[in-house]
Amino acid sequence: MLNGLFFAALILYFIATVLELGGMVFKKEKVTRLAWWLFVAGALCNTVYLVARGIIAQRLPLSNQFEFATAFAWGVAVMLIGLQVKSRAEWMRAAAMPMAFLILSYAALQPREITELMPALKSAWFGLHIGSAVFSYAAFVLAGCGGLRWLLQEKKLPKAQLAQLDYLCYRLVALGFLLLTVVILAGAIWAEQAWSAFWTWDPKETWALITWILYAIYLHLRMRKKLSGKVMAWFVVIAVPVVLFTFVGVNTLLPGLHSYG
């Protein structure tokens, strides 16, 4: 049953993505409406899967690459649903739905066995540190989706709508940046308790810091209005691969203290 929920979410995300893109290209509103509700159903399966896995494991399901990727896809989906409810974010769906599907597809390639937490992970900081990372990464990915929409629709959307889109990307980055700050600070305190050192320049720590600095630069430039909306859109789009490398690439290519995942 547990695997069935996971693959139901994966299949629903895939079908929703195909229908959303097809409906957008051929301007079929009924198709995109169906795509949306299938995506919501996928997010529900994703949610139930994580809850069930957590109950079975008797811990938060965030301890390895598979669990984090599954939660990451869920974070993208849940935040997109929240944006849709609050801001009618149809413009972001065609980019965000494929991201949720691709992240969950990556999870499907990882070992799915439920294992006991390593002693170093049995900490009160576990949920705050990793849970904040889930939503931080999701916010950055959605900001990138918004930036991509800005670039693709620059000549078609009125200036007021482009400005609104730019502001939403800014708010998503600000949220992601705040959460990433929590990730780094909580991780430093946790590391001092587990390994007697606040900072070890572990590859994951280093790339998290690089990501933090990158988005700090974006926020500085955006608040000072130093660059155009187009440059800012390119910034958040190009920053997404850095986020994904911090998540996937570091664990795969650069072994360190975080290699347990």
Feature roles, as predicted:
Residues 1-261:
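Polytopic transmembrane helical bundles with strong interfacial aromatic enrichment
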